[in-house]
A protein has these predicted regions:
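Low-complexity, intrinsically disordered extramembrane tails and loops of integral membrane proteins
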Residues: 1-24, 69, 239-258
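Proline-rich intrinsically disordered, low-complexity coils
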Residues: 7-9, 170, 203, 214
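Generic N-terminal initiation segments characterized by hydrophobic and/or small/turn-forming residues
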Residues: 11-13, 64, 73, 202, ...
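Hydrophobic alpha-helical transmembrane segments in multi-pass membrane proteins
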Residues: 22-63, 81-106, 111-159, 180-235
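Perimembrane loop-to-helix junctions flanking transmembrane segments
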Residues: 64-82
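Acidic, glycine-rich loop-and-strand cores that form catalytic or ligand-binding grooves
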Residues: 160-164
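Membrane-helix boundary/juxtamembrane motif in polytopic membrane proteins
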Residues: 165-194, 238-250
Length: 258
């Protein structure tokens, strides 16, 4: 950031406008990079689900064939098939972790413009690392890391939405408000989830909780889509603002030289 102290009011305004162009240009690039990582993650998740169904059937058939051929019933002959599927899961989670780290890189890079992105990025990494660790755990440990991962996701979403709202406030008040709305709806869904889970353990009211949970899940799904759309719109908004401001500065400089 250039030193504006000692400059005339007009010079200070010019410096701040140039910094605005740089900030919006870079943030637009980082947000678009993050958006592409999100889309890549979704595509990878879909491919993984399809591949998991196919490979699980293949490995299960391989295990069954090995048991029949070996004439064993203790399950040892089927270890190869089980191990093969476990290796597949480890590879999948490794790729997911790499995508997570790539996304965190773009988030943390924006911290030089607005405080809060680094915190959001670190929680984003924590969620990805915990999800990776879950592959190597089982039973109680799995639930423990799954719970921690969910908590990290919640903290990330809150920090990211709040910081995005602040970052867009000077250039796009509409999108800034949309990020604030997203955060509020996220909080409402979390509260509703807690209420439904609580109702599920109350005798005679469990059916109400079971009815409410699927609706809340649909709410989280809709919110996730909205979140992705907002990331894209925010990236596009930053690029538009940067171009508009750069064009205006260029015209003013040309007019001054004429």
């Amino acid at each position: 950031m250039e030193n504006v102290y000692g400059s005339t009011p007009k010079e200070r305004e010019l410096i701040l406008r140039k910094e605005k162009v740089v900030r919006c240009t870079e943030m637009g690039r980082y947000l678009m990079g993050f958006f592409k990582i999100i889309i890549a993650g979704i595509v990878f998740a879909v491919i993984t689900i399809v591949a998991s169904v196919i490979l699980y059937g293949v490995f299960a058939a391989s295990s069954a064939s090995a048991l029949v051929a070996g004439g064993k019933t203790d399950g040892l002959a089927g270890d190869t098939g089980i191990d093969g599927f476990n290796v597949f899961l480890i590879v999948v989670q490794s790729v997911a972790l790499l995508l997570n780290l790539a996304g965190a890189y773009f988030i943390i890079r924006m911290n030089k413009f607005f405080d809060g992105f680094k915190t959001a990025g670190l929680f984003y990494i924590a969620q990805g690392v915990l999800s990776f660790i879950m592959v190597f755990t089982s039973d109680g440990a799995y639930m423990f890391f799954q719970t921690l991962s969910a908590i990290m996701s919640v903290v990330y979403m809150m920090n990211f939405a709040i910081t995005m709202s602040k970052a867009l406030e000077p250039t796009d008040s509409y999108l800034s408000d949309e990020w604030t709305k997203l955060k509020k709806i996220f909080v409402y869904l979390l509260i509703a989830s807690g209420v439904c889970i609580g109702i599920c353990i109350v005798p005679g009211l469990a059916f109400l909780g079971l009815i409410g949970l699927p609706i809340i899940c649909l709410g989280f799904l809709a919110m996730s889509v909205w979140y992705i759309v907002l990331v894209y719109k925010s990236a596009d908004s930053m690029k538009v603002v940067a171009k508009r401001e750069a064009d205006a500065l260029s015209k003013e400089e040309n007019a001054a030289l004429a």
